[in-house]
Amino acid sequence: MSLTNLTLKAAIDGLAAREFTSVELTRAHIEAIEAARGLNAYILETPDKAIDMAAKSDARRALGEAGPLEGAPLGVKDLFCTNGVRTTACSKILENFVPTYESTVTSQLWRDGAVMLGKLNLDQFAMGSSNETSYFGPVTNPWRAQGSTKALTPGGSSGGSAAAVAADLCLGATATDTGGSIRQPAAFTGTVGIKPTYGRCSRWGVVAFASSLDQAGPIAKTVEDAALLLTSMSGHDPKDSTSLDIPVPDFTQFVGKSVKGLKIGIPKEYRVDNMPAEIEKLWQDGIAWLKEAGCEIVDISLPHTKYALPAYYIVAPAEASSNLARYDGMRYGLREEGANLTEIYENTRASGFGDEVKRRILIGTYVLSAGYYDAYYLKALKVRRRIAEDFDNAWTQCDAILTPTAPSAAFGLGENSNDPIAMYLNDVFTVTTNLAGLPGLSLPAGLDANGLPLGLQIIGKPLDEATVFSVAGAVEKAAGFTAKAEKWW
């Protein structure tokens, strides 16, 4: 067994027991990354920096100064600013941008002893559900349907993070989730991903898409690994005005905790048209597993669910059009010349932004314009409030909610890329938690008939990641999901 096959927890235990060093563990991952370049998961490899960080980690351990993630090699979604290391958001406009500061989330991981392997691919500015909008090309899912060589999407926007974890190219990865960008890729790649409560992780140093929806979180191999990473990533940050000043528990203590007596809500509105029978069956399996673990199953209603997707695709582009106004070619990033200032702006943005980003800027600018603001944007905000109220009402009946993560297994690269609506429908089960600011976790619970992974989602009350991890631990144990992508790369 290669060192790269280890879970994060097993690797940390092995390092603590002196079975191997961080340099050895890191080198094994660097070799795996080099062999897997065809997947395009990493858009920037930092092997020298990784070995340097690993050597320093081994030195700290020798002095008895090991942090909670000491010596563990991780991947970083290229939306997190990394001091002195190129950060692009996978756009042409930031192709050569090198930040002079470190995002809060990554600096906390390095503080706890983790090692950086490189920067991971994503949909441009985190806008997309298939990783096909990246300026650096799509990521290929390490999973393939049985008997097929067809390239599949790893999901998006955190496709690089999910593919790298699934292919054992890191022990865990940072990711972000604005409408499902952690959970849908996790479901497509047989990995675990959690979007915590809005404000649990600092957004400082994370390239902004939609500021009221964006939230950082980890993608990992197991529920326990995700809990380990989230514990390090969370915490109050005065540099982010939306960061919550509340204590962070050690989330790992809740994994494996009994769920006996918990009430699990099953929302009837999540039974959508054309949902594959396999996903419905998996949902029923999840219900049965939790019943066996001692949970009480409660039918609940989230009546405004059907408006969530349209509301999301008004609110998110509106915020994006505002956030992306800063890319003007003046202070940083790409600059295309022109005869006057307006022309420089136009040329820079026309050349620097990809089609999907332009589409969302146009939608956002339209819904914020005079005459349409009330009809679209204000209405979407009212719907958002109603969705949050639906959840508030549900919490009087249940402690957590169980749903599928995505309406399908991974689809082929290029299959939906010319149909934005079909692409947006990928988020049908995930956007509600972003609109309401709730924690949501996806974990792999089974394979479809083609041997592709399917995920279940657990949604929790605000700031109750503890219960989410307990329920996820129970589902993980019952599902016994150990399948890995067969290595073809």
Swiss-Prot record:
InterPro entries, A to Z: Amidase (IPR000120), Amidase_CS (IPR020556), Amidase_dom (IPR023631), AS_sf (IPR036928), GatA (IPR004412)
Reactions it catalyzes: L-glutamyl-tRNA(Gln) + L-glutamine + ATP + H2O = L-glutaminyl-tRNA(Gln) + L-glutamate + ADP + phosphate + H(+)
Pfam families: Amidase (PF01425)
Keywords on record: ATP-binding, Ligase, Nucleotide-binding, Protein biosynthesis
Enzyme class: ligase
GO cellular component: glutamyl-tRNA(Gln) amidotransferase complex
Gene Ontology terms describing biological process: translation
GO MF annotation terms: ATP binding; glutaminyl-tRNA synthase (glutamine-hydrolyzing) activity
Residues annotated as the enzyme's active site: K77, S157, S181
Transmembrane segments: none
Assigned EC number: 6.3.5.7
Membrane keyword on record: no
Similarity-based family: Belongs to the amidase family. GatA subfamily.
Subunit organization: Heterotrimer of A, B and C subunits.
Role, per record: Allows the formation of correctly charged Gln-tRNA(Gln) through the transamidation of misacylated Glu-tRNA(Gln) in organisms which lack glutaminyl-tRNA synthetase. The reaction takes place in the presence of glutamine and ATP through an activated gamma-phospho-Glu-tRNA(Gln).
Protein name per its UniProtKB record: Glutamyl-tRNA(Gln) amidotransferase subunit A
